[in-house]
Amino acid sequence: VHVPWFDGALLDNIVDYITYAFMPMVLLWSAGYLGEGRSATVLAVIPLVASAYQFCRVDAKTEDHLFLGFPSYWNIAAFYVVVLDLAPTAAAIVLLVCAVLVFVPIGYVYPSRTVRLQGLTLALTTLWLASYAVLLTQVPDPGPVWLAISLAYVVYYVVLSLYLTARRLRATA
């Protein structure tokens, strides 16, 4: 049903913001992973503000299907904070680095849409999702093999994102 005054894309962004930014910060803050007191609250708010900026960008997705700036993968950041049982200082470093990267024009892979190496990326993403599910069942004692598989995907994702960014910059130079 088409309702002319209803913007489904806006609703999708609202749901995504709550799911990928707000709830992960509530989890980390309420479970004590960010420490205690005012500094923990400020630390939880920083990714929320960075994500608000990211969600409002009209150029958040590039023509070659990359996210421009760190996408709001705060749920994944929170996952690793919990699985690795990071101390508040380590969690703060992870969150602050990711928050800064929101503003750095690096293109990040959109796994289901980025064309370059899509088959490999989707296969590795599927393996990563399986490792994610297994690791969730193993908290607080994650198995080293599943953790290595999971983190290897993160390395692949970052390396591919940097490669595609460099390739795009060379093409426009």
Predicted regions span which residues?
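Multi-pass membrane catalytic core of lipid/isoprenoid biosynthesis enzymes
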Residues: 1-54
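Cytosolic, membrane-interface loops and tails of multi-pass inner-membrane proteins
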Residues: 1-5, 58, 65-68, 173
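Hydrophobic alpha-helical segments and their boundary regions
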Residues: 5, 39-40, 58, 88, ...
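Hydrophobic side chains within alpha-helical segments
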Residues: 15-19, 57, 78, 108
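Membrane-interface elements of multi-pass transporters and channels
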Residues: 30-34, 62, 170
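Membrane-anchoring/interfacial helices and their immediately flanking loops
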Residues: 50-72
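C-terminal membrane-associated helical module and adjoining short loops/tails
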Residues: 64-173
